[in-house]
Amino acid sequence: MDLPGDSSPPGQPRLCRQPLTRALWGARSPKRPRLQLPGAPSPLEKASRRVLAVVLEDVMAVHMVPVVPSKQTSIPQHHSYHQDPVHRQPPASPPRQAGWSSQARPPDPLCLCREPLSRIHRTSSTLRRRSRTTPGPEEGPSQKVDRAPQPTLVVMLEDIASPRPPAEGFIDETPNFIIPAQRAEPMRIVRQPTPPPGDLEPPFQPSALPADPLESPPTAPDPALELPSTPPPSSLLRPRLSPWGLAPLFRSVRSKLESFADIFLTPNKTPQPPPPSPPMKLELKIAISEAEQSGAAEGTASVSPRPPIRQWRTQDHNTPALLPKPSLGRSYSCPDLGPPGPGTCTWPPAPPQPSRPRPRRHTVGGGEMARAPPPPRPCLRKEVFPLGGVGASPSLTTSCSSTASTSFSEPAEPRLGSTKGKEPRASKDQVLSEPETKTMGKVSRFRIRRTPARPQLNLTPMGLPRPIRLNKKEFSLEEIYTNKNYQSPTTRRTFETIFEEPRERNGTLIFTSSRKLRRAVEFRDSSLPRSRRPSRGVRAAGGRTVPPNVAPSPDVGPLLQQRLEELDALLLEEETVDREQPHWT
């Protein structure tokens, strides 16, 4: 099937175009058979390693080829891809895909196969020599602990030049190289071609692949590192990359593919059954205690702020812990409790409540019915403790270790819902002192006012208290003269008394003062009408007082009478003149 844009001759094998994203859903597609061993990585890991394979080498090929001595051939090192007319043809098998650049067009019949890197078990001493000794990006430090059952990545070099029939059924934009493979024993091999010395480029080798001297162009095969059934590294020839233009393309895309593979396509760890472990209980605490000491012996008691988990598991539960005094850790309020063996468990379970359970008041889940658990000690530290010995019960009230892990220190007063009569603790040094417990309070013990506080009525609008004035009418002389607000009257406020001390002025005795005082009142005659005071506006409008020389004299009447007579005479003259004028005309 001819793909669009395929310029290769019809007789030569074509390059199947396929995007890199097909590796993600194609690996999980039900139409494609999965060749995955029990120790093989997941399809997502294969897809991520397929992208990593594109980044690591320009034309690096990873192929899943079992080792069969009868079918494998070796090619000498000096053999070039221009001089190889005959290529081996492996049997057909389900195709495996990988991404290739859209600008890569091989001018000769060479099939470059890209398949995901994978890890296999070490089967021989030769594979152990080729196995990786340092963890790569896809192998975290957590895998160093269980190194024995983990598979190993084997990198081998082999010739990749072989003809293949044109693949059908893939119509995508990015070309993809597919080579079938089917052998007796499955074994994943990384193939890397070697270019001629004139066109040699230093390949990109991150820490994902081992720094093997075979990555550089070899000059002679190494018999100590080669299997007799696999081709020597001298037969691995790298095609010339200048007509394809792969080197500049991979240099530009390399950083993007690396970041994409590191972020999104980090392979998952091979699922393994977890080792059987005792039941663990997570405890929410605030301050993280100090780290456990690695050199602590098995039979000695812990002196750290809390007994380390190693001592909890290895220490004998029948030996009681002897603590002379509580050693406080970083929280300075948490005594050391020692291992929770049956000998040290002296805290009794919570007695049954005499009253019926009532719903909690100040909790997030307000509807839950809460019986009073054993009173928790106010030490809050984030720690992990196992649930106790062999025969310990995981319940809260019967398990000694769970009681020890949930309650660290006893408050001074019992809870409100529990009974008042509690057994005294076995060791008083493990209980907090009184000043420490008095500072600790519970929300349920805070008193809540059911009625609001009465507002004070004698406050000013600014909130200041108003002065309280007495309604008392009669005051004694002591109250008057001792009152801070009392002031003696000034000269203006002094009263004139009837009997006054006479003063002598100019040889005469003056019994009364001449100045007017406020107590001098003039009593008017009530029968006379009151004189109205003119308003200030009218007084201002008048504005001026009549001078006394312009005031009317007493002979105004005769003067007015004379003026009126003159006016009458003038009017009579005018009437007589009017009567004579029309007669003249």
UniProtKB/Swiss-Prot annotation:
Keywords: Acetylation, Chromosome, Myogenesis, Nucleus, Phosphoprotein. It is found in: Chromosome; Nucleus; Nucleus lamina; Nucleus, Nucleoplasm. The modification N-acetylmethionine is found at M1. Its main location: nucleus. Residues 518-535 are annotated as: Required for nuclear localization. Residues 136-365 are annotated as: Required for nuclear lamina association. Pfam families: Tantalus. Residues 393-409 have a biased composition (Low complexity). GO terms for biological process: muscle organ development. Residues 23-46, 73-150, 189-241, 290-445, 525-557 are annotated as: Disordered. Residues 119-132 have a biased composition (Basic residues). The modification Phosphoserine is found at S277. GO terms for cellular component: chromosome; nuclear lamina; nucleoplasm. Residues 85-378 are annotated as: Required for the interaction with GRB2 and sufficient to promote the phosphorylation of AKT and cell proliferation. Residues 193-205, 337-356 have a biased composition (Pro residues). The keyword Acetylation applies. The keyword Nucleus applies. Residues 1-135 are annotated as: Sufficient for heterochromatin association in interphase and chromatin association in anaphase. Functions in tethering peripheral heterochromatin to the nuclear lamina during interphase, possibly through the interaction with heterochromatin protein CBX5/HP1 alpha. Might play a role in reattaching heterochromatin to the nuclear lamina at mitotic exit. Promotes myoblast differentiation during skeletal myogenesis, possibly by stimulating transcription factor MyoD activity via binding to CBX5/HP1 alpha. Involved in the positive regulation of the PI3K-Akt-mTOR signaling pathway and in promoting cell proliferation, possibly via binding to GRB2. Interacts (via proline-rich region) with GRB2 (via SH3 domain 2). Interacts (via N-terminus) with CBX5. This is Proline-rich protein 14. It comes from Homo sapiens (Human). The gene is PRR14.
